[in-house]
Amino acid sequence: MQNEELTLFRDMARRAMEQEIAPHFEAWEAAHALPRELWNTLGAAGLLCPDMPEEYGAAGADPQVTFAILEEMSRMGFGGIATGYSIHSNIVAPYINNFGTEEQKNHWLPRMVSGEVLGALAMTEPGAGSDVQSIRTNAVRDGDEWVLNGSKIFITNGMLAELVIVAAITDPGKGAKGTSLFLVDASLPGFERGKKIEKLGQHTSDTAELFFQDVRLPANALLGEENKGFVIMMTELPRERLGIAAQAVAAAEGALELTVNYVLERKAFGQTIASFQNTRFKLAEVKTEIALNRAFLDKCADQYAAGELTADDAAMLKYSSTEMQCSTIDECLQLFGGYGYTIEYPISRYYADARIQRIYGGTSEIMRELVARSMLGR
């Protein structure tokens, strides 16, 4: 996609968010909740699932457009909304488009594009985070149906989603290779939402426990082939990690912009704190770290568009960008002094929203292990 086209999409997205999100965001943050109608509004604005095919009502754009929208949300400080958006548009929709049947795509994608259906992805369990082989949720065949039982935790969009892609064991003897994915309609009997999980940050991203008690799924709820769920998840992880990196770099850029504006205005000892050498050096360090990760992100985005992004590069990018996000925003907050620790100043939200980025989508520790394996073998 040409830079001019991408800039147009960015501008359109930013205008829509300034109009539909910015005036209400502080109230949503305080309430620790997001109105369900926002997703319909974003759908009407053409911002949901923009790189899905036109035949499903989407723009048929390049994936870079989805990443650009993610970046604008993150740069503006809407970290929680960006995470919910990423799950819906950057993960769930591509799963269905890439591995679903035509029947599944026609049933779900148009409604995801419009915002009528909000998507969630349910992999993590109380005893299975990074270790997919420890999943206990299971699906058993019963005639032409599957019977789903188990529970999931830390599920983004879990309180509001109408569609949940659930990872479940279908062949216990095969471990992770016996995992399948199912498209679960949240209106089905036996599907229950637990409590909303309160978090350190990202308060506008609802996070929930989900329970499945004898949920009867039709045969066509299986996404992809039976026992190929792990393969599908591994195939889609580079895109997920690219999206997280886009959030990380853009949020750091937004935090830096806030900080520069602050130090140019704030005075101490009779002069602006921007005139102090420590301030100037810290800002120079932060800008450099962001620029390095921006270059790596853009390179990986180009590789993804060409079908060349490797799992190794995606892991390095996710690790580097999220560690950078946390460290640079910490430096920015320090320059605000005590004000930076108050909710009144947005830098505190950038700080709180950043911390989870080193955990979800693969922890920094797992990313380092993956990179090491690529060099040294198992």
Identify what each model region corresponds to.
Residues 81-103, 129:
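N-terminal glycine-rich flavin-associated loop
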Residues 134, 187-218:
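Flexible, small-/acidic-enriched active-site or ligand-binding loops
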